[in-house]
């Protein structure tokens, strides 16, 4: 059985991989790392660092993974159900593992742990209990083998009665079993919209071992992976991008109206329903253990990081909703019980709004409207009253009343000024998150264009 997987399963180093696509670079293992009894792991460190990407130097070249099974069973004439044992191997070509045996002491094979190399996203259900413990690297050919004979996940029954010609009955039973296997697996093949079953062919041969003759049934299963990115773009990227754009447009709603938070809750609920509906369309390998955590739109090459991209979109929506709730609460507290803005926060706000660097608010002009009076500005002192101009009792009462009115007016002005500062700070936070949204959308579009062209 042969599997074609175009490109890497993940793009952990997206920027590096896009820059080095198609350059034809190869990695040659240094021979000083090869000893008489062992190989220094540092010699393969450059290969281990690239385990997140496909073992190719040009992503337009497909990686061919050949899967072979060895089935064996001990037939029991008194048993109706026979359980088969299997041993499978998956060799593929790794362009990063290369060395010259003549210069490396004649060493042609080296074993290494599976966690250090790229693994093909092909899983044999119920074939082995766990992932093989090691790989065998043999001159750019990597083989993933299971060292133990494990039980296969399917069983076949063949029942015949002893007769004059038991070999004919046995051959007839083989034909019945192969026919049922072929029909059953053709109808129950689960594509998950990722794999296409090309066909199942079988042939029966006779094998002679010593003086005994055995019949062997060989099945050739051909599958192909869907390489077209159009279904993923239409089903996943376009609806998700539309919902993200709608959530970004909600930043234009005024925070004081109180309609921003309910609108974002509705969009978040709609995106959650979209993820639940698309759960059945996601490939079975979208949550692979060796999937990348970067490159959210790498499903143009392979659908592995689709779940990561959706998680990033959902995180942005949740963060936007929490930020809206926090700003609404901040505005409510600022209008009911205004507190003075901290000095460091005031300096940061002046730094942002003074030059128009990161906040869309306009700088204050002049000293119009309520504000601090000139007598409370730094460096300005109140005029002194001379001894000859002391006010009388009636004038003192009028002066005291005017001072109380002025103090009350100054207190209201300071309160209003504090409210304005908190409002400016809230709008600055809202503008910062809006720019983060725009940055994420721009990077997503650029990544889609780059991956589509490559």
From Swiss-Prot:
Biological process annotations from GO: chemical synaptic transmission; inorganic cation transmembrane transport; monoatomic ion transmembrane transport; regulation of membrane potential; serotonin receptor signaling pathway; serotonin-gated cation-selective signaling pathway
Transmembrane segments: 233-253, 265-285, 307-327, 432-452
Residues annotated as glycosylated: 66
Topological domains, Extracellular: 25-232, 286-306, 453-454
Expression sites by tissue: Expressed in liver, as well as fetal and adult colon and kidney.
Cell compartments where the protein resides: Postsynaptic cell membrane; Cell membrane
A cellular component term, taken from the record's GO annotations: neuron projection
Domain of life the protein comes from: Eukaryota
Catalytically driven reaction(s): Na(+)(in) = Na(+)(out); K(+)(in) = K(+)(out); Ca(2+)(in) = Ca(2+)(out)
Alphabetical list of Pfam families matching this protein: Neur_chan_LBD, Neur_chan_memb
InterPro entries in the cross-refs: LGIC_TM_5-HT3 (IPR049944), Neur_chan_lig-bd (IPR006202), Neur_chan_lig-bd_sf (IPR036734), Neur_channel (IPR006201), Neuro-gated_channel_TM_sf (IPR036719), Neuro_actylchol_rec (IPR038050), Neurotrans-gated_channel_TM (IPR006029)
Annotated GO MF terms: excitatory extracellular ligand-gated monoatomic ion channel activity; serotonin-gated monoatomic cation channel activity; transmitter-gated monoatomic ion channel activity involved in regulation of postsynaptic membrane potential
Key words, A-Z: Cell membrane, Glycoprotein, Ion channel, Ion transport, Ligand-gated ion channel, Membrane, Postsynaptic cell membrane, Receptor, Signal, Synapse, Transmembrane, Transmembrane helix, Transport
Signal peptide as annotated in the record: 1-24
Assembly with partners or alone: Forms homopentameric as well as heteropentameric serotonin-activated cation-selective channel complexes with HTR3A. The homomeric complex is not functional. Heteropentameric complexes display properties which resemble that of neuronal serotonin-activated channels in vivo.
Function: Forms serotonin (5-hydroxytryptamine/5-HT3)-activated cation-selective channel complexes, which when activated cause fast, depolarizing responses in neurons.
Family to which this protein belongs: Belongs to the ligand-gated ion channel (TC 1.A.9) family. 5-hydroxytryptamine receptor (TC 1.A.9.2) subfamily. HTR3D sub-subfamily.
Description of its domains: The HA-stretch region of HTR3D seems to confer increased conductance to HTR3A/HTR3D heteropentamers compared to that of HTR3A homopentamers.
The protein's name in its UniProt record: 5-hydroxytryptamine receptor 3D
Gene: HTR3D
């Amino acid at each position: 059985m042969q599997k074609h997987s175009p490109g890497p399963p993940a793009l952990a180093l997206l920027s590096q991989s896009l820059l080095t696509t198609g350059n034809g670079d190869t990695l040659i293992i240094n021979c000083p790392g090869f000893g008489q009894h062992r190989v220094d792991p540092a010699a393969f460190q450059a290969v281990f660092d690239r385990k997140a990407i496909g073992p190719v130097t040009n992503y337009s070249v497909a990686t061919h993974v050949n899967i072979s099974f060895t089935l064996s069973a001990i037939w029991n004439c008194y048993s109706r159900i026979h359980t088969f044992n299997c041993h499978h191997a998956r060799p593929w070509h790794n362009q990063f593992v290369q060395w010259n045996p003549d210069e490396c002491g004649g060493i042609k094979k080296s074993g290494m742990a599976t966690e250090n190399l790229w693994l093909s996203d092909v899983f044999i259900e119920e074939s082995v209990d766990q992932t093989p413990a090691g790989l065998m690297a043999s001159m750019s050919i990597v083989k993933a083998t299971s060292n133990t004979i494990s039980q296969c996940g399917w069983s076949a029954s063949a029942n015949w009665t002893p007769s004059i010609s038991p070999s004919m009955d046995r051959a007839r039973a083989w034909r019945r079993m192969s026919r049922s296997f072929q029909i059953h697996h053709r109808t129950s093949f689960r594509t998950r919209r990722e794999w296409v079953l090309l066909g199942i062919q079988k042939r029966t041969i006779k094998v002679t071992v010593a003086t005994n003759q055995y019949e062997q049934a060989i099945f050739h299963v051909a599958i192909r992976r869907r390489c077209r990115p159009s279904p993923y773009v239409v089903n996943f990227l376009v609806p998700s991008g539309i919902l993200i754009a709608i959530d970004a447009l909600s930043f234009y709603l005024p925070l004081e109206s109180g309609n921003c938070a309910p609108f974002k809750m509705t969009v978040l609920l709609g995106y959650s329903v979209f993820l639940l509906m698309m759960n059945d369309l996601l490939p079975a390998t979208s949550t692979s253990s060796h999937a990348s955590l970067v490159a959210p739109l790498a499903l143009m090459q392979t659908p592995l990081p689709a779940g990561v991209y959706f998680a990033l979109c959902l995180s942005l929506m949740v963060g936007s909703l929490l930020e809206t709730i926090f700003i609404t609460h901040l505005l409510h507290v600022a209008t009911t019980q205004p507190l003075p803005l901290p000095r460091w926060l005031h300096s940061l706000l002046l730094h942002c709004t003074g030059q128009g660097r990161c906040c869309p608010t306009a700088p204050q002009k002049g000293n119009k409207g309520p504000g601090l009076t000139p007598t409370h500005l730094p460096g300005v002192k109140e005029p002194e009253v001379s001894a000859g101009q002391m006010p009388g009792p009636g004038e003192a009462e009028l002066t005291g009343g005017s001072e109380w009115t002025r103090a009350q007016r100054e207190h209201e002005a300071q309160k209003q000024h504090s409210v304005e500062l908190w409002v400016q700070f809230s709008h600055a936070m809202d503008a910062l998150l809006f720019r983060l949204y725009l940055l994420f959308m721009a990077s997503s579009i650029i990544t889609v264009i780059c991956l589509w062209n490559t």
